[in-house]
């Protein structure tokens, strides 16, 4: 009992220190503006199983060719696929910086403003099928697309490659993959203590399934809402590599995670645990690819990011020292530069094909 009391007191002290530290950080740096408030032209895409997917399109300024595109043979559309427990707002910094291009953002099923799917429909393969419908809806005809995926969003792109390999090298002209892997998540996350990592990893799907069932789901949701500063600390630790990341950015990530129901976290957690997309990497290699990995990623082991880049013949890898899993929020300048570089490679390939035609 004394140990429990001491542990509780320690948690309170830790929470107070976090709150004080957060206040000091706010005083030192200016908060990013309008986090999650950028909006585009809304569109609803209905999946084959009846789930409404919320899509937003940002058109570039009228009659303006992006200065960074030397050869724009066709209007290029970049489609962004967000990660597990997040929504399209996580691309805030990319949306703000890449507006000279035609940008498409969507909430994956069961996330953000998209609808809930039936029990058993939470699978990575289903997300790949959804992405195919998004492409058809927002980039009809021969309009080329570049796909960008963070974490689970990268696996969504891999699932599309498995289902529709013919799109890559024709419709899909480039791919950007951030903080993701093709397999190996069942080996556990880097933050888990090494000796007990296999045990924790095997137990995780069972724990999530139990937490999402019946009255337990209500208890878990209540606990999540009351977590306060301790939730802030865990989000900062798991999501970011730099402990000095602005607290407004940590809060932004935390709010997205909190808005995801525990049932969705459970269902897609199991799907991610079992994912193996290694057979799709040859297909991705048909187009220019850039992969990005933070060396402080505590959710997807950086070694898996290295393996991914090595397995894709056309991949260029961007290694980001000090960055964690939420790379798109923590190192947006690096991510934006990598995407811009990918577009330049796509354009160079298109120009070369035109010259040889």
Task: Give the location of each predicted region.
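Conserved hydrolase catalytic core segment
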Residues: 143-191
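An N-terminal hydrophobic leader/cap segment in hydrolases
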Residues: 2-44
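Short beta-strand/loop motif that positions the catalytic acidic residue
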Residues: 284-285, 291-293, 297
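Conserved HGGG/HGGXW glycine-rich cap/lid loop of the alpha/beta-hydrolase fold
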Residues: 51, 56-116, 150, 155
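Catalytic active-site module of serine/aspartate enzymes centered on a nucleophile-bearing elbow/loop
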Residues: 306, 310-357
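Conserved alpha/beta-hydrolase catalytic His-Asp/Glu region
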Residues: 212-283
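Flexible "cap/lid" loop of the alpha/beta hydrolase fold
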Residues: 170-219
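Conserved acidic catalytic loop of the alpha/beta-hydrolase fold
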Residues: 128-144
């Amino acid at each position: 009992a004394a140990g429990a009391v001491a542990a509780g007191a320690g948690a309170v002290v830790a929470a107070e220190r976090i709150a004080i530290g957060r206040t000091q950080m706010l005083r030192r740096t200016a908060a990013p503006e309008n986090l999650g408030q950028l909006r585009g032209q809304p569109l609803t895409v209905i999946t084959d199983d009846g789930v409404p997917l919320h899509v937003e399109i940002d058109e570039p300024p009228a009659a303006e060719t992006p200065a960074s595109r030397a050869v724009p043979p066709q209007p290029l559309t970049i489609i962004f696929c967000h990660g597990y427990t997040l929504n399209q707002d996580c691309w805030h910094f990319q949306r703000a910086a890449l507006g000279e291009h035609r940008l498409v953002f969507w909430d994956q099923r069961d996330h953000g403003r998209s609808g809930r799917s039936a029990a058993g429909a939470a699978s990575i393969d289903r997300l790949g099928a959804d992405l195919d419908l998004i492409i058809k809806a927002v980039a009809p005809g021969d309009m080329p697309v570049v796909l960008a995926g963070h974490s689970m969003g990268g696996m969504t792109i891999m699932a599309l490659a498995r289902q529709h390999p013919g799109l890559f090298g024709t419709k899909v002209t480039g791919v950007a993959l951030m903080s993701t892997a093709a397999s190996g998540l069942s080996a556990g996350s880097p933050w888990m203590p090494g000796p007990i990592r296999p045990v924790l990893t095997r137990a995780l799907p069972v724990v999530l399934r139990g937490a999402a069932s019946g009255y337990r789901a209500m208890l878990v949701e209540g606990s999540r809402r009351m977590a306060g500063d301790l939730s802030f600390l865990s989000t900062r630790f798991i999501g970011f590599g730099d402990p000095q990341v602005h607290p407004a950015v940590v809060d932004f990530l935390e709010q997205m995670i909190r808005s995801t129901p525990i049932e969705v976290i459970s269902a897609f957690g199991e799907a991610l645990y079992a994912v193996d997309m290694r057979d799709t990497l040859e297909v991705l290699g048909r187009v220019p690819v850039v992969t990005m990995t933070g060396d402080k990623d505590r959710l997807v082991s950086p070694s898996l990011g290295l393996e991914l880049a090595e397995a894709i013949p056309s991949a260029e890898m961007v290694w980001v020292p000090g960055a964690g899993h939420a790379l798109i929020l923590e190192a947006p300048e690096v991510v934006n530069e990598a995407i811009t570089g990918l577009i330049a490679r796509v354009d160079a390939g298109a120009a070369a094909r035109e010259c040889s035609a």
